[in-house]
């Protein structure tokens, strides 16, 4: 179906015909833990990767399979692996690339959970990270060490929606024989496909825009199929015979899909952050309306940014669509159809004013999720990024007067009126 447009692919890939067992047009929920083999040889072939198909529910499921194929197609990858959460997708990706003694280069301004994973949790397992200003290409390249295993970026940083120059950083990574990993959660494949700009691996918290309704946890890893795992000699767990899987080389056995096949066969097998069939089904429902929802998110965001940029109680709006934003040129290059419906602004005052503004909103919900059809708000410094010290917060341009908004799909008049009510409360009106 590669010739079809995005809006068609999001509805049909993975189930081009009715379900062969039931003739159901909707993708069924295959709520099972295991699968019957036709005979002993069939079982042996499945376990030996000689025959593709279901082995056990921790590894594969037919509902999950449709979701994986659909997101892989939307991102332009060769294969994908769904996980129980976005955090699991990111963790598995790094664990597949780096072991004790290895090193990662990562953008400074990333999601707080990803920052903590790289800065604290993985250091306990011997993997270190150098955080860089992704706008300084020399700094990015100078951070690469002999033991570096990957460069890690976000298409739109969390929470400020800052934008790296993906093409340029991909060239640096590939010059040093490294894969470029990009979290495209905020970008979505409808607005940007990082693989087309040189990314080798794309990850998502599918909980966000892909699901879109704040109901379902899930993550997904997309393999571009373009990285040569054998060339550098650095990725033995993927390219060399694997002793925990009867000596198979995933690069040989799975070809372009070696990366996600390794994660499925080894990391998912051993640690089990498996997506449930029901969650895969719900994420498929979200995928089917992705383009429609994103268009409304973008339309509303443009109007909210304009409103905030001209409001006397706003100190600064951190949105790349604004001409004065340092990433404006990159925004126009990588997001010609708009984007960044999750962003921050700094209210005049400090923490007290930020809290009062937030606590007087009614349409916006105060919660930690983003990318919902409902508009959402939070104070990052005291919540999502509260594990960071003052210096780390400043590096990510998060202050006590910083407020994060996730613009939903409500009527724009109601969104603006709610924000006005928040500002009025701060003024004591």
What is the meaning of each model-derived region?
Residues 222, 344-346, 406-408:
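Short hydrophobic/aromatic beta-strand micro-patches
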Residues 76, 147, 313-316, 363, ...:
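Glycine-centered tight turns that cap/initiate beta-strands
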Residues 271-274, 278-280, 285, 289, ...:
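Conserved small-domain helix->loop->beta segment predominantly found in fold-type I
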Residues 119, 128, 146, 293, ...:
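PLP-dependent enzyme catalytic core of the Aspartate aminotransferase-like
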Residues 2, 10, 14-18, 80-310:
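Conserved PLP-enzyme active-site core in the AAT-like
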Residues 1-51, 428:
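N-terminal glycine-rich, Lys/His-bearing helix-loop that initiates the first secondary-structure elements
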Residues 39-88, 113-120:
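Conserved N-terminal alpha-helix of the aminotransferase class I/II PLP-enzyme fold
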Residues 156, 185-187, 322, 348, ...:
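Active-site beta-loop-alpha junctions enriched in small/polar residues
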